[in-house]
Amino acid sequence: MFVTNFLPAQRADLDYVAACVSVIEMDGFTKVKDIQLANGSNALRGICITPDGKYIYVSHNLGRFTVPTSQLQQGWMNTSAFSVIDVDKQEFLGAIVVDEPERGAAGIWSIACNDESVFISHSGTHEVSVIDHKAMLEKFLNYPNKAVLDYDLTFLYGLRERIPLEGNGPRNMILNGDKLIIPTYFADILNIMDINTNEVTSVELNPEREETAENKGERYFNDASHCFQNWQSCNGCHPGDGRTDGMNWDLMNDGVGNSKNCKSMLFSHVTPPNMISGIREHAERAVRAGFNFIQFFEVSEEDAVCVDAYLKSLRPVPSPYLVNGELSDLAKEGQKVFEKLKCGECHSGVYYTDMKYHRIGEDIEFEKGWDTPTLREVWRTAPYLFDGRAATMKEVFSVHKHGIEKKVSEKDIEALTEYVNSL
């Protein structure tokens, strides 16, 4: 069995950061290996197997985190791709980019195939790609240097047709015989495509539906039409309902050559200042700057207010470390360690942040230090510290001694880790 991992499970301060596909042995249900995809692979959403059982296709985002976020042309920040895995060898062969040189195909989501075609939904550009399967595979297998294929924006020339859909935000889809059935997440419209003719008919499932400001904001957050050449949406760096892609990015708002780990948007509007360096005084400013300097798009104030409303509506997912919704016995011990080490002097209040700057840890870039992040839902925002140098929360304490100025036992570190991961 091949299982996608949504995000990279590693430290982020490396030259190669990518999510993996795990191979599971079904007899004992044990993991055989992890197959790491192309550099920058994240948000692994779709997976399918070819009819002959030879190849696995995985649809995902490609984050170009090794360069500053200074432009968007030709997929400078984010591109969309699907990776090819050899089933028998259990090896990654290469990644095929589905964008075009002057037009992105953002929000890649689901993937399906039959002998004749490969079908891919694009939630950010509201369309489906139909790729000539046999011609694509032949060209792929004969490609001279697959290590650089994930930068080739011309690979699918003449092999792919982009079919626009009714509605907004096509995500999951079903291939059923000669029909491809594609609902749109933000419009409640069902698209049915005849795969023999590529003709699309649509049905409104909820014609009386009315959008709230939060609904509109979520739609704008995921819509690549609010971006220069449709290369990305806010979802490109903040997948999984406004959370994080697990990678470091060199934004231009606090200098160049100083990449920092992507932050979750959860509680961003109630824990100012914003960004790891605190360079934005509040989240409202950060939202508008994000459209201007990351999407390269002039967002209207009306739309920006809706995005604010959406982000304010985000709520934490209960931690899987909880037991029946309560702290485990180990986490309760960790709470005592948290208090003993005076972690609450910085991580205080309902959001576990005093919203102040502190000089803590290594390589302090700014004289005033770093903005104190919330610890709520921190279990799902690895890696940790300003540049993602800690792959796990335990490493924050055991390796990097974050805020710990005296010797702490392994038992206490285990308990502290359990507690923080339970918040």
Predicted regions mapped to residue ranges:
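Charged, compositionally biased non-catalytic regions
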Residues: 20-22
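Periplasmic c-type cytochrome electron-transfer domains
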Residues: 3, 8-9, 13, 17, ...
